[in-house]
Amino acid sequence: MSGSQNNDKRQFLLERLLDAVKQCQIRFGGRKEIASDSDSRVTCLCAQFEAVLQHGLKRSRGLALTAAAIKQAAGFASKTETEPVFWYYVKEVLNKHELQRFYSLRHIASDVGRGRAWLRCALNEHSLERYLHMLLADRCRLSTFYEDWSFVMDEERSSMLPTMAAGLNSILFAINIDNKDLNGQSKFAPTVSDLLKESTQNVTSLLKESTQGVSSLFREITASSAVSILIKPEQETDPLPVVSRNVSADAKCKKERKKKKKVTNIISFDDEEDEQNSGDVFKKTPGAGESSEDNSDRSSVNIMSAFESPFGPNSNGSQSSNSWKIDSLSLNGEFGYQKLDVKSIDDEDVDENEDDVYGNSSGRKHRGHSESPEKPLEGNTCLSQMHSWAPLKVLHNDSDILFPVSGVGSYSPADAPLGSLENGTGPEDHVLPDPGLRYSVEASSPGHGSPLSSLLPSASVPESMTISELRQATVAMMNRKDELEEENRSLRNLLDGEMEHSAALRQEVDTLKRKVAEQEERQGMKVQALARENEVLKVQLKKYVGAVQMLKREGQTAEVPNLWSVDGEVTVAEQKPGEIAEELASSYERKLIEVAEMHGELIEFNERLHRALVAKEALVSQMRQELIDLRGPVPGDLSQTSEDQSLSDFEISNRALINVWIPSVFLRGKAANAFHVYQVYIRIKDDEWNIYRRYTEFRSLHHKLQNKYPQVRAYNFPPKKAIGNKDAKFVEERRKQLQNYLRSVMNKVIQMVPEFAASPKKETLIQLMPFFVDITPPGEPVNSRPKAASRFPKLSRGQPRETRNVEPQSGDL
């Protein structure tokens, strides 16, 4: 793998880990919810940390690899234990108690599981950051366990691991560490297919190291894989017979089978050291492609004789799919023969029928290979014709038993030599004498040569996937995951946009609701005003009607004396009822019209008065502000002026004529010691003078007034600023604040000292507040101050401030 590929791999691992950490922080960060391993985000986070710590582990681990190989040879460990795991490095930094804790877990039986349990325990206890600092601290120890191109050896990227672990401290993890699933792919009692599959993998690894051609390697792997895959761990038919070397060994094996049914040992064929101990040699001449197997005790049984056995119906009546054939062999030594040293393996699938099987198979000769397919037998003539035999695999154990394998599919590398298989280096290597004899297995099918994949059972398809297919499936799955993540991001962006749009719509709806509520309130107030006005009109109408009726009654009583005649008789003027009603209606109508006209005039007059009042108030406010700008503040300024107009007029008419301004600011001193001086202009009636003060003097005045008048604390005094206090904008803002502060202080003095308010004088003000003492600035003549009348006309806002003299005098604003 090139350097760029290693760099891309490390960057890919870093991005995946960052994404997993981010997803966990988004889901569980800042919440009280517990993050358990049932959540896919937590599982993904653990998997990414494992991938980072697993990346670039060295294959050779010294004592650790040797111990794992010894455990595997002894049957205490599976094949996967020989793969390097990050637990070998992690346990170097753990203390005795921590190691004892992880080794005492009940359901953790492998180093892979212990490493995963340590990672999850560190997440639970928020100690992963500390462990990662310990793991990355010793670079020499890291180089012992990891390659130079590994992730943890990359200082730039590995330094981010403790930071990411620290970011997970806000999450409450509750991950189960004593879980048997952490051991990886669980392996129960090995079956025949498991054993043959491991031997096939060993042969494959040896063939890859040999110098044979690619075609020979491919055919050997395919042939072995087909046999190993098609072996089912549990057979539905009766168990096939097993031939023993002798009767005593056969009986001994039967007893051991009944006692130890489930004990199996997994032996690997790829370690040369183990094969030296066993003494078995598999060797083949380079030109002939013959295979021979010889045991160290030279007591193997020659069992392969020449025969042709077609696949016929077995003991259960099932039809075999393929047939097997072997070269013609004899036991008398006339022809070359194959020796097969077969070590026994306890078959857990042979159960109730084994007594009958051993009894029927003790006196027969058995043949294991066939070279060409033959016609099926019509009847069961003998046991060798009842069952179809596959090539016998050599499995080492304590007893010598041949184990038959029923062939479902086969492959023949007859045209290419089989690679040399050396499982030992001792002096007992033997070569078959006949170079022309070839070990060949031909593929055949009952039909027209259907492919091998069509004959495989569906349950064995996942086992037949090669590394390239698994890699392709993984790449496809990762591509699909990236597509889903991209789609998820786009959907999330759309969701965020819709949420923002929805929030804007909700805000707009709330604004409209407030506007509608305000309009309803105004309309309700109008309705109430109109209702009150209507009630007033009703009352006025009743009064007018009452007045009209009273006038009518008075008119009738005035006409009554004229109705008496001279002779003393009463004569009543006759008047029609209709005329009376019409007259009343017309009078009511006239009165109503008059009332309506009067009411309209009143409303119009009221509106005109209201508009005039608003205009006058605006004018008064403007003139008051201009007065403040020209003559200084009125007592209390606008905010402190009484709402009662009469009281305000009283205050204005009786206030003391004391005005204060800060018209300008000057910069004095040199560059290093430059400071600003504020010109303060005070006028009491016709007496006026200027003083020049720095900000520190204003600040000391403020502290003294706070002690004397606690109410001064509420006044807005500009704070001190150490950096940027020479800025023109800042100085102008401070000038306005100091001017308002002095005016507020002057109003407070007028309120608190009635004598000064009654007779304001310059001497009295200086006695009360020495801050206002008139000190002539250096370099100015004492009598250079002109009269106030000559300078006062310059008090206009239109006069630009930049045209003033460097030393402004009395009234110079």
Swiss-Prot record:
Gene3D superfamilies attached to this UniProt entry: 1.20.58.900, Phox-like domain
Keyword Phosphoprotein in annotation: yes
A GO term, aspect molecular function: phosphatidylinositol binding
Region (Disordered): 269-299, 346-378, 778-813
All copies of domain PX, residue ranges: 656-779
DNA damage among keywords: no
Keyword field: Coiled coil, Phosphoprotein
Phosphoserine carried by residues: S268, S291, S292, S330, S344, S445, S450, S639, S642, S646
PROSITE patterns, sorted: PX, RUN
Residues the record lists as Phosphothreonine modifications: T641
Boundaries of every RUN domain copy: 36-180
Superkingdom as given in the UniProt entry: Eukaryota
Residue ranges with Acidic residues bias: 346-357
InterPro entries, alphabetized: PX_dom, PX_dom_sf, Run_dom, Run_dom_sf, RUN_SNX29, SNX29_PX
UniProt feature coiled coil, ranges: 466-545
Family membership noted in the UniProt record: Belongs to the sorting nexin family.
Protein name as catalogued: Sorting nexin-29
Lineage of source species: Eukaryota, Metazoa, Chordata, Craniata, Vertebrata
Gene: SNX29
